[in-house]
Amino acid sequence: MNLLIIITINITLSFILISIAFWLPQMNLYSEKANPYECGFDPTSSARLPFSMKFFLVAITFLLFDLEIALLLPLPWAIQTTNTTTMMATAFILVTILALGLSYEWTQKGLEWTE
């Protein structure tokens, strides 16, 4: 019963905060706030730099493999448990899924900088 109350309160608070964050910024729209500021002068060029999608894909792939390492680091301690078969199967499934994802990314040429 306590868990149900806590979940209800969390969902309600989350909904209220998301609603406030969605509606509050739209109350005051000033065009000056959207412009970049360069010591009172008009900007000479665009303040927004282009973003490389290739870099983004490589960065996301790095984060996935970094997370894999973080998940596999406790394996030496998990080997000491009584149920090593389940632990090894879970680790094998995790590594297999990530290897399949990497091979798919490689075949789709998502890891190459030049086209």
Swiss-Prot record:
It is a multi-pass membrane protein. GO terms for molecular function: NADH dehydrogenase (ubiquinone) activity. It is found in: Mitochondrion inner membrane. It comes from the Eukaryota. InterPro entries: NADH_UbQ/plastoQ_OxRdtase_su3, NDAH_ubi_oxred_su3_sf. Gene3D superfamilies: NADH:ubiquinone/plastoquinone oxidoreductase, chain 3. The keyword Magnesium does not apply. Keywords: Electron transport, Membrane, Mitochondrion, Mitochondrion inner membrane, NAD, Respiratory chain, Translocase, Transmembrane, Transmembrane helix, Transport, Ubiquinone. The chain crosses the membrane at residues 3-23, 55-75, 86-106. Its EC number is 7.1.1.2. GO terms for cellular component: mitochondrial inner membrane; respiratory chain complex I. It catalyses: a ubiquinone + NADH + 5 H(+)(in) = a ubiquinol + NAD(+) + 4 H(+)(out). The keyword Membrane applies. Belongs to the complex I subunit 3 family. Core subunit of the mitochondrial membrane respiratory chain NADH dehydrogenase (Complex I) which catalyzes electron transfer from NADH through the respiratory chain, using ubiquinone as an electron acceptor. Essential for the catalytic activity of complex I. Core subunit of respiratory chain NADH dehydrogenase (Complex I) which is composed of 45 different subunits. Interacts with TMEM186. Interacts with TMEM242. This is NADH-ubiquinone oxidoreductase chain 3. It comes from Rattus norvegicus (Rat). The gene is Mt-nd3.
